[in-house]
Amino acid sequence: MTPLMEQYANIKKQYADEVLFFRLGDFYEMFNEDAVEVSRLLNLTLTHRADCPMCGVPYHASKIYIARLLRLGKKIAICEQVGEISPGGG
C-alpha cells in the first residue's frame, strides 16, 4: 500500500460512516466502497488504480456533488491536502 493510500485508510477508519472526499490536487477523490457508491449515485465514471476502485470530482464543482449526496441522505467528510503530492503518489 502506498503512503497516500495508508493515509486515506487511516482517515477513513475515523469516518467510516461518511463518504470521504479526499483532496488530491484539483480533485476530490473517493476510493473503494465510497467510489463504487458515489459513482452509482451521481453517475460518475468508476475507474481503478492497482485494483482499487476510484472516482473523483473537480474541486471547483465539489459543492454541487456534495449537495446532491447530502440530499440523498449521505454524510460527507472532507480531507484537504496539505503540502505537495510526491511523484510516487505518497
Predicted regions and their residues:
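Basic, polar low-complexity surface loops/patches
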Residues: 1-90
